Swiss-Prot record:
One cellular component (GO) term of this entry: cytosol
Organism whose genome encodes this protein: Campylobacter jejuni subsp. jejuni serotype O:6 (strain 81116 / NCTC 11828)
Protein's recorded name: Nucleotide-binding protein C8J_0350
NCBIfam families, A to Z: PRK05412.1 (NF003819)
UniProt cross-references to PANTHER family, sorted A to Z: UPF0234 PROTEIN YAJQ
Residue ranges the record marks as coiled coil: none
């Protein structure tokens, strides 16, 4: 039995689930009756995790956004992890949505501070885009998991490498 247990807190997105949500949203876009006759498109830039929505009607842009977010929820991706980057108008209305797939330094500090303030007997350290949490008892690690889930973060939090 190990003398110290640990796990990593990460915000990594499953790229395959992102792609599956995109494919499902595209399929729904083709079959929706209220979108017939209106030029609408959904594209995914997998490298940057950006959804590019475009429509000839500004009102239908929000419908496209709702479709994408509902499909992401069904695929297990936290809707709070989706940020609206830009909204453009012209001949076509465009909207870019970014899926946050990393813990930035501000959120890492917020998580680390919450763990330290909880007075649990754990050690936490920021390691790039992950936070390593270590403790002698697994119960303390489970308490930290619960604490982090209850924080109101706009990330898709996941726990990996529980040892």
């Amino acid at each position: 039995m190990a003398s110290e247990h640990s796990f990593d807190i990460s915000a990594a997105l499953d790229k395959q689930e992102l792609k599956n949500a995109f494919e499902q949203a595209k399929k729904e876009l083709d079959s929706r009756y209220d979108l017939k006759g209106i030029k609408c498109e959904i594209d995914l830039s997998e490298k940057e995790s950006i959804f590019k929505l475009s429509s000839s009607s500004e009102g239908k842009l929000d419908v496209l956004k709702d479709i994408v977010i509902s499909k992401l929820i069904k695929r297990g991706i936290n809707p709070n992890a989706i940020k609206e980057l830009s909204r453009e108008s012209g001949a076509m209305f465009r909207l870019n949505l970014k899926a946050n797939d990393a813990i930035d330094s501000e959120n890492a500090k917020k998580i680390n501070k919450a763990i330290k303030d909880s007075k649990l007997k754990v050690n936490s350290s920021i390691r790039g885009e992950e936070i390593r949490v270590a403790a002698k008892q697994i119960d303390d690690l489970q308490a930290v998991m619960k604490l982090v889930k209850e924080l109101d973060l706009e990330l898709n939090i996941s726990f990996k490498n529980l040892k």
